[in-house]
Every structure is written in C-alpha cells, then in structure tokens.
Curated annotation (Swiss-Prot):
This is Parvalbumin beta 2. Residues 38-73, 77-108 form the EF-hand domain. Transmembrane segments: none annotated. Ca(2+) 1 binds at residues 51, 53, 55, 57, 59, 62. GO terms for molecular function: calcium ion binding.
C-alpha cells in the first residue's frame, strides 16, 4: 500500500521498535518510517490509506488499528497509546484527525 512512498525496511524497523505494548510514540514512528521528510502529497497519500472508511478523517477506531496499515500482523495500539495519539493530532478538539492535522503531526 505504501510502495513508492515508504521503504519496506523502514516500515519493518519501525514496527519492530514498537512491538511491545506501551512503546508506540507517533513522532518516533513517523521518523523511523521516513515520513517526516516526505512531501505534502506523499503525507496526504499515507493519510488516505490510514483513513480506512474514507471519511476524510482518522477516527479513534482507525488510530487503534494504525500499525496494521503497515503490516497485517502488527498489534493494535493500547487504549492509552490511542488516546495519546488522538490528543496529539486533534488540534481542533473534534475527536478526530483531519489531513491537515495529520500533516502537522507528522512534521511536528
């Protein structure tokens, strides 16, 4: 799904680094997968993949399964990790993350 945007080796390394529950931090993950240095267009493409229901927002249930976008066998985020991730990205407080909020969080 991320072919041409992200390197498989970077994804594998990023997933390995947060395999244990409670070890996921979005900033570290975005850095490890090489997303921070990508163009706005590429970040928007990644957002489109994570936005499973194509609502133009990433909601809490989609964040919980965030890692599974990168590998089907990856774990779900814990409730605490999901809440922290949502809070970090939801700058307008509407309970979901839009594409501009996502881009700001990635670049953060």
């Amino acid at each position: 799904a991320f072919a041409g945007i992200l390197a498989d080796a970077d994804i594998t390394a990023a997933l390995a680094a947060c395999k244990a529950e409670g070890t996921f931090t979005h900033g570290e993950f975005f850095t490890k997968i090489g997303l921070k240095g990508k163009s706005a267009a590429d970040i928007k493409k990644v957002f489109g993949i994570i936005d499973q229901d194509k609502s133009d927002f990433v909601e809490e249930d989609e964040l919980k399964l965030f890692l599974q976008n990168f590998s089907a066998g990856a774990r779900a985020l814990t409730d605490a990790e999901t809440a922290t991730f949502l809070k970090a990205g939801d700058s307008d407080g509407d309970g979901k993350i839009g594409v501009d909020e996502f881009a700001a969080m990635v670049k953060g």
